[in-house]
Amino acid sequence: MKVIKTRNVQQALPEALYQLSFEGVRRDSRNGPVFMFPEPVTTVYLRPAERVLFWAERDANPFFHLMESLWMLGGRNDVEYVARFVDRMRSYSDDGLTFHGAYGFRWRQHFFEDQLPKIIAALKENRDDRRQVLSMWDADADLGRQGKDLPCNLQAIFQIACDGRLDMTVTNRSNDLIWGAYGANAVHFSYLHEYVARSVGVEQGIYRQVSANFHAYEEVLNKVAPLADLAANPMTGTETPDPYAAGIAEPYPLMSTDPEEWNQELMMFLSEPDAVGFRDPFFRRVAIPMMKAHKAFKQTSNPSRFDAALAELDNVAATDWKLAGVEWIERRRAAFEARKARAMDDGVAYE
């Protein structure tokens, strides 16, 4: 068992790529050749709330990661909501309408009851409880199924540690370290972790993800491989560039109001993001302006759409999401201007 113990996802990705460059074994897979670690890998996040990835080489979509996390906490499985942020998500659905293995739906509806309130109530009643397991894998529905979407993450185990904080351990059968573990999973599951911790009334502790198969697809790996050179080196004292460690970015609390009220506001946000009356600062100062920024960016008929999106991002109180959003928009502005310049050089009109 390999253990990658790290402060946050920003530092985890270069470290894993560095170790994979020495230990990776090339192997075929259902979706093309991969380089994989020859043994299971556990990632230990000491500060899981530092969940945002800033590497330009990875180009993580902060709007998608944030909104998909809320979609999961809302127990949804519909394609349409997440496809507005990443259209290719439709290709992972068997029927174009729902996702078979949607994590949030598994948490809150698939097993005919909402698992999260039961786990929260049990931990509030007994802080020494070791039986609180959130299930995602369903042997009846998943074992032997030949579909596009099966849960990769199988269970999340919640226990209050000796220091009084809530720790979470997630088990995973097959994990793409670039797109899954150190991208989407770091956001989705750290928000699940924080949601349960705040609902119980304790601080968020350590998040561990145990991946039985930890790999990177060769084609994608080649694009981000240079990040391995930025892994921390204790021998030389070199540290990984990290906006969190530099004090440029910091997490923003997911929940500041009563959990029941927060849940109601989550449902309202998912169905009516333009509604008024949100009380929790997370919705008013993070989720809503992030949603508005993405909506402005998608107005392709507006020649000022990049500036409009950045103006909305000025209202985001979460410095980590704000920074990631600004950088993501600016990368797209730069690409747009480059294409426009090439079109002018070729003597053609650009639209």
UniProtKB/Swiss-Prot annotation:
Gene3D superfamilies: Thymidylate synthase/dCMP hydroxymethylase domain. GO terms for biological process: dTMP biosynthetic process; methylation; symbiont-mediated evasion of host restriction-modification system; symbiont-mediated suppression of host innate immune response. One of its GO terms (molecular function) is thymidylate synthase activity. Keywords: Host-virus interaction, Inhibition of host innate immune response by virus, Methyltransferase, Restriction-modification system evasion by virus, Transferase, Viral immunoevasion. It catalyses: dUMP + (6R)-5,10-methylene-5,6,7,8-tetrahydrofolate + H2O = 5-hydroxymethyl-dUMP + (6S)-5,6,7,8-tetrahydrofolate. Its EC number is 2.1.2.-. It holds the Pfam family Thymidylat_synt. It is an enzyme of class 2 (transferase). Belongs to the thymidylate synthase family. Catalyzes formation of 5-hydroxymethyldeoxyuridylate (5HMdUMP) as a step in the pathway that replaces dTMP by thymidine hypermodifications in the viral genome. As a final result of the pathway of hypermodification, 5-aminoethyl-2'-deoxyuridine (5-NedU) substitutes for about 30% of thymidines in the viral DNA. These modifications probably prevent degradation of viral genome by the host restriction-modification antiviral defense system. This is Deoxyuridylate hydroxymethyltransferase.
